[in-house]
Amino acid sequence: LILVDTSGILSALFPDQNRHHECAQALLSATPPRIISPFVLAEVAYLVQKFGGVDAEILFLAEIGRRAYELAAFDEDDVEDARQIIHKYRTLGVGLADASIAVLSKRYDTFDVLTLDERHFRAIRPAPRKNFRILPADG
């Protein structure tokens, strides 16, 4: 079980990205499910289209349709939890996508996250006395 962040997925998808091989390997070797927040999905889809074109976006969305990732549900209570995380870490500029991963970490009781965003995910505490295990950095 792994949570996926925008930077980790983009790095895994595009060979010219920083740490591509490590991110691709971490993603492929992760035991399913690979959990994606709807906010991360929106970011990834936008950036895949921007840098890879509409055909690349269509291919990525087909992966979601084939359930290569589990698209997590997010309701109003989850948004409130994310808002509280954004407020708590406001000096770091943590946004909704990153905060949603912290919310999902609690729900799924996992601390593994595929990301290159060490600045935010080293600071965010997903649970008392718990840290994220950042992949591929901590792998």
Residue ranges and their predicted role:
Residues 1, 108-139:
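Acidic, PIN/NYN-like endoribonuclease modules and their adjacent C-terminal/linker elements
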Residues 30-31, 66-67, 92:
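Structured helix-beta-strand junction loops
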Residues 70-116:
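Active-site neighborhoods of divalent-metal-dependent phosphate/nucleic-acid chemistry enzymes
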Residues 1-36, 49-62, 127-128, 138-139:
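Short, well-structured N-terminal submotif of metal-dependent ribonuclease cores
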